[in-house]
A protein has these predicted regions:
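Juxtamembrane segments flanking the first transmembrane helix
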Residues: 2-99, 105-108
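Cytosolic-side ends of inner-membrane transmembrane helices, especially those
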Residues: 31-37, 183, 187, 191-208
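Extracytoplasmic/periplasmic sensor domains and loops in membrane signaling proteins
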Residues: 74, 105-139
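Short glycine-/small-residue motifs
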Residues: 103, 163
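A short beta-strand signature within small-molecule sensing/ligand-binding domains used
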Residues: 130-132, 140-153
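Helix-start (N-cap) segments at beta->loop->alpha junctions
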Residues: 151-155, 165-184
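Glycine-rich acetyl-CoA-binding "A-motif" of GNAT/NAT acetyltransferases
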Residues: 160
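Membrane-proximal alpha-helical signal-transduction linkers
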Residues: 205-219
Length: 219
């Protein structure tokens, strides 16, 4: 006596499963490329949004060449206070000797006048090359974008008078990326479920047609 074949053992389910796996693989590859491109684009837009205008860099460089350090530091503080960008966590202005001449953080003014120990800042002062990197702060579990840009004396591209150190919070960017990725994942799961159901229906029709006897007419 033939036992009844369970649905998951039937040819209908196997055909549908193969179709669903192929669809899942395709969506996974497309999703990986999509998320990577999205991250690249969002980060590029973010970096462009927080980039300081050239006139601010020029103003800071001018103050660093001033012999009146006290007045220059006040001007630097005023210039940094005009930078209105909530994504920027903090900006430092460091002179050619490695002395911190200003910070945008009102609660961190105590570092002004101190010599920086940051290796990246020191290297930028020496090699005259900008440096950018993404960092993860294990203390607060936040990701940051760090940019160190040399400040050049007016009319002399080889004379580094200081650097601008900028630190910006990336959590908003990755929150947007995660939200969009979640929407894509939800849509992909719905597509797979619908595809699985459609594949079952199609496989049933194909098998039903294959079992239909063919009548051969003879004359």
């Amino acid at each position: 006596m033939n036992s009844k074949i369970k649905f998951y053992q039937s040819i209908h389910f196997k055909i549908a499963l193969v179709f669903a796996l192929m669809l899942m693989l395709t969506l996974e590859v497309v999703g990986a490329v999509f998320v990577r491109q999205l991250e690249h684009q969002e980060l590029a837009n973010f970096k462009q949004q927080i980039e300081l205008p050239s006139y601010i860099d020029n103003s800071l460089a001018t103050q660093l060449t001033s012999t009146d350090t006290k007045t220059a530091n006040k001007e630097i503080k005023t210039i940094l206070a005009r930078v209105n960008n909530t994504s920027i966590t903090e900006i430092w202005v460091v002179d050619a000797k490695g002395i911190i001449r200003g910070t945008s953080s009102s609660g961190n003014q105590g570092i002004v006048g101190q010599k920086t120990t940051d290796t990246v800042i020191k290297n930028t002062l020496v090699n005259n090359r900008s440096h950018t990197e993404n960092l993860y702060d294990s203390a607060n579990h936040n990701r940051y974008y760090v940019s160190v840009v040399p400040l050049l004396a007016s009319g002399n591209a080889n004379n580094v008078v200081g650097v601008v150190y900028m630190r910006a919070n990336l959590e908003g960017v990755y929150s947007t990326i995660n939200s969009i990725s979640l929407i894509y994942l939800s849509a992909a799961l719905i597509t797979i479920v619908l595809g699985l159901g459609l594949a079952v229906l199609i496989s049933r029709e194909i098998i039903r047609e294959s079992k239909t006897p063919v009548v051969v007419l003879t004359t």
